[in-house]
Amino acid sequence: MGFPVGYTEVFLPKLFVQTLSILGFIRTIVFSIFRFLGLSDFLEMDQTWPDYTSYPTRIPETRSPFSALLIREILPVIKFEELTNSGEDLPENCAVCLYEFEGEQEIRWLRNCRHIFHRSCLDRWMDHDQKTCPLCRTPFVPDEMQEEFNQRLWAASGVHDFHCPVTELL
């Protein structure tokens, strides 16, 4: 059993067309009521909407967050060749951009987890208000420096007194 082959092919489009016709009729009635009440200004059909497809998908950030600036002060920037002379076992490439490290390149050496990254790669990561290693998620700020970091961040925020003076109500 079942439906005849042509039944669904005709039924669904016909139902769709009837639904659209009913919606069009309701629209006409609503517009007529608005015109009758003198509210036709609210029915501007000439309204042009901005074309958001021509805008860039993301507006680039122009400033770094305070926390990123403070973390940059904490994390050392050194040349890669200085680390190679120290005799430590170092990765061959940056885990963010996957380019190899070269002797004169500036890198940031994370104190907590000992990972290294190109300076520009890690700075871009911090500009997005990230406060952990991109590889292992260990916090950038060592535990022994966390209190000092929080105080400097509080001072940089511009809020000098969090607590309001208590006044009596009459």
UniProtKB/Swiss-Prot annotation:
Its main location: membrane. GO terms for molecular function: zinc ion binding. Disulfide bonds: none annotated. It comes from the Eukaryota. Keywords: Brassinosteroid signaling pathway, Developmental protein, Membrane, Metal-binding, Transmembrane, Transmembrane helix, Zinc, Zinc-finger. It is found in: Membrane. Disruption phenotype: Vigorous plants with thick inflorescence stems and enlarged leaves; more rounded tip in rosette leaves and more serrated cauline leaves. May be involved in the brassinosteroids (BRs) signaling pathway and regulate the growth and development of rosette leaves. Seems to prevent over development of leaves and inflorescence stems. This is Brassinosteroid-responsive RING protein 1. The gene is BRH1.
